[in-house]
Amino acid sequence: KFSGDNREIKVSAKIMGSWLENKIGNYEGNFSDHSGLGVGSMMSSHELIRFLKNSEWQASAINLMQSFKVKKTQSSTLKSYTNFIKAKTGTLNYVGNMAGYIETKSGRKLLYVILGSNLEKRNRLIKSDRDNPPEAKIWNKKIRSLQLDLIESWALRYN
């Protein structure tokens, strides 16, 4: 249980790692800070799926996620499609990740993890551009559009 105390970043990262290990068992990832967003933080898509599966449909996990609706209005199939899509996103400096849950119209429950990055652009950033990288907004829109296209495709395919 987290106490809310301000702790050193490394101690906080260790607490997060212990918490995750308690949820999914052994893992090969790494937290460099409490948020998991630090440069040294790493986790595989497989480990993220294990976490989602072990937390599956718990209100504590789902309430942290955004709701998404199928948006493609030109398709008659999608116009009448209703489903449950929840996502937790992480987008920063040419890294755009999304993970969450889909419940299809038929009631089938799916888990997904989509990890996307342009590490070449990210690694070329100079320190002064890290808060607002050039072209990052355009890249973020493209990766988000691709992620939502994949989710919508899976929701329909596995209905």
Regions found by a protein language model. Give the residues of each.
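Active/binding-pocket-proximal capping segment
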Residues: 61-75
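Short, well-ordered beta-strand elements
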Residues: 108-134
